[in-house]
Amino acid sequence: MDKAKKQELIATYSRKEGDTGSPEVQIALLSERINHLTSHLKEHKKDHHSRRGLFMMIGKRRSLLNYLESVDIERYRDIIKKLGLRK
């Protein structure tokens, strides 16, 4: 992910100016990295080192989503809908 894409995601999901640490921003950035790595692993099936990193990122995103769900269910539902994480 290049710098411009990262800044765009931060601007889209931040709650206020300069907000980079809110769960919404972290979830959005992790989702972008997960999507990129997933496409990489479809081509390079034996790249187990990157696969482990993918699983760790998915776990981190899951824990952030669990936190957000327990703190504010509306923000949780909003981020799920924006990112299209649930069917």
From Swiss-Prot:
Cystine crosslinks: none
SUPFAM superfamilies: S15/NS1 RNA-binding domain
This protein's GO CC annotations: cytosolic small ribosomal subunit
Highest taxon in the source lineage: Bacteria
InterPro entries reported for this sequence: Ribosomal_uS15, Ribosomal_uS15_bac-type, uS15_NS1_RNA-bd_sf
GO molecular function list: rRNA binding; structural constituent of ribosome
Free-text function comment from the UniProt entry: One of the primary rRNA binding proteins, it binds directly to 16S rRNA where it helps nucleate assembly of the platform of the 30S subunit by binding and bridging several RNA helices of the 16S rRNA.
Subunit structure: Part of the 30S ribosomal subunit. Forms a bridge to the 50S subunit in the 70S ribosome, contacting the 23S rRNA.
Entry's family note: Belongs to the universal ribosomal protein uS15 family.
UniProt xrefs under PANTHER family: RIBOSOMAL PROTEIN S15, BACTERIAL AND ORGANELLAR (PTHR23321), SMALL RIBOSOMAL SUBUNIT PROTEIN US15M (PTHR23321:SF26)
Protein name: Small ribosomal subunit protein uS15
Species the sequence originates in: Clostridium acetobutylicum (strain ATCC 824 / DSM 792 / JCM 1419 / IAM 19013 / LMG 5710 / NBRC 13948 / NRRL B-527 / VKM B-1787 / 2291 / W)
